[in-house]
Structures are given as C-alpha cells and as structure tokens.
Regions:
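Short alpha-helical segment of the dimerization/phosphotransfer core of two-component systems
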Residues: 68-76
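Primarily the dimerization/phosphotransfer
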Residues: 18-52
C-alpha cells in the first residue's frame, strides 16, 4: 500500500541520514586526531630551534639537536604522506581491481623489508607457493602487506624468527605473518583499522608508527 511504501521510504531516509552523520563524525574525529599528531612534533621542533637560537643551557651541542630536529621533520613528512594517501583513497578515485600473482606481490614486499630484518639479525621463515592468483587492488594491498611486515620486524626482538605463510584453502587465500615479539592486546583488536589508533602510543612513537598503516 501507499502507507507501507511511505514507511519504507522514511525508514530508508532515516538509515541514510544516520550513515551520513556517522561518516561526518568520523571525518571530524580524523582531522582532529591529525591536527593533534602534527602539533606534537611541531612543538618539539619549535623547542629545539628556540633552545639553539637563544643559547639555552643544554642546547650547546647544536649538531645533536639538529639531528633530533631532522628526525622530527622526517616523522612529520611520513605523517603528511600517509594523510595525503588516506585523502586520496577516500576521495572519488575508484579502486582498480585486477588479477595478480599474489605470491609475487608478497615476495616483492619481502624484498623491500629485507634490509630492516637483516639489521636486527632476524630470520624470515617464508612459506609461499610459486604462484597464487587472485583479484585485488594491487597498490593498496602492497601497502597493507608492507605495513604488517614492517610492524612484525619492528616489534620483534633481534635474533628472532618471523614466520610468513601464504596459502589457498577452499578457494580462499590466507596470509599469515607471525612474530615472536610484542602481541596486540585482545581489547585493542577491534580498533586496529581506526585512524591513528595505536595499542601503545608511547611505544609506537619510539618506533615511528603513524597509526594509519591499516586505516
């Protein structure tokens, strides 16, 4: 009936409005968090420069504080790059899905992080088939794999092993990256895909994470 159609239309409109409100709230929270993340390194950088320019006690070693300032700038640059990437992927650009050799994608990303694991004398135990085809958005998938690999290496102690397995079970591809270091607490798991979320903010600041790797 016309009444039922009107009720259905009203319910759909209400649902759409609630979704839009939720998205807007996410945007507000995202930019608020982004502002905070940029403000902290800027404050540190300003303190270093002010101390050196004004000859404040403790800042006599300019080389040391210039190196620290450069590290802060590097962190800010990485964060800005991540923000630009997120802005791009949340825009009007459509994802380009295509069939790729997923095993080869994994191997390429492993090669990009090999220097990092060698520095810590870690052993990567890799079990990946010769070929494994699937349809993915390659750029975003490469980024996600690299972020997980880098985190596994960063948060594992030196001289430890990291197990990497890729397999296909009943038509579903399963990738596993298991390290022997710091584990994510159970209560943090639901938040892993939130912007800027870090299970331990102080620990992640020391290792250079932005909290956008899985967003």
């Amino acid at each position: 009936t016309a009444l039922n159609d009107l009720q259905i239309a009203n319910q759909q409109l209400k649902t759409d409005m609630e979704k839009e409100q939720a998205l807007e709230q996410q945007r507000v929270e995202f930019f608020s968090a982004a502002s905070h993340e940029l403000k902290t390194p800027l404050t540190i950088l300003k303190g270093h420069l002010s101390g050196m320019l004004n000859g404040i006690s403790g800042y006599e070693n300019n080389t040391e504080y210039m190196e620290r300032s450069l590290a802060v700038v590097d962190r800010m640059e990485n964060l800005v790059k991540e923000l630009l990437y997120v802005s791009k992927t949340e825009g009007t650009q459509k994802s380009a899905y295509k069939v790729v050799d997923f095993a080869e994608v994994f191997r390429v990303q492993l090669a990009t992080v090999s220097d990092l694991s060698e520095e810590k004398k870690q052993h990567l135990e890799v079990n990946i088939p010769d070929r494994l085809y699937c349809e993915v958005e390659q750029v975003q998938m490469e980024r996600a794999i690299q972020n997980i690999l880098v985190n596994a290496i960063r948060y594992s102690p030196s001289n430890e092993s990291i197990h990497i397995t890729l397999s296909e079970i009943h038509g579903t591809i399963r990738g596993e990256i298991e390290n022997t270091g710091v584990h994510v607490p159970d209560d943090a798991l639901p938040h892993l895909f939130e912007a800027f979320y870090r299970a331990d903010a102080s620990r992640n600041r020391n290792t250079g994470g932005t909290g956008l790797g899985l967003y």
